[in-house]
Amino acid sequence: MKTIYGVLFALLLIQCQDTKQVPDVSLLQKAQLIHLTTTTLDTHDDINVKNFTDSLNYTQNLDTQVNLPKMQAGALDVAWFIVYTGQGELTPEGYKKAAENAQAKFDAIHRLVEVYGKNKIALATTSKEVDSLRKIGKKVAMIGVENAFPIGENIEEVARYYAMGARYMSLAHNGHNQFSDSNTGEFDNT
């Protein structure tokens, strides 16, 4: 009988234990090691061209989605800076305004990598360039275009965007345009 009471008492003590899980330090260290030895990237970083000036830019710890101090602190290797243009009118004036917006964003990204942060970040257009830049301790900027609207009716603009470093382009973004319908259903009430 004493054995049964002993077993029941032991079970009761087990049930009364603090059930908070203690973090497995070795597991956290392993995760951190993986993070530090793997190429980490953020595939969508919106930008504001007002944050790409001599006095205010992404080499500073700004209240932005990403910047160099945040990339360093979070061990982020690659930021895909986005050349986004909201959908406007499908007119010559609309295309001109959109093209100016897109060009301003391309220019801002190039100022970051060529002037303000040239010793800390560089533009990559291939995975080999990403690897090479990581090996020398630089952060990496890549460029994506959200909304093909700014290229207007001149498909040759795609090649120019490519030459400026863009490596992907979505056809539409939050609105129908000259290339594609979007999910917003402006014309078909869907």
Located regions from the model:
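Sec-dependent N-terminal signal peptides
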Residues: 4-13
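N-terminal hydrophobic targeting/anchoring segments and the immediately downstream early-domain regions
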Residues: 16-188
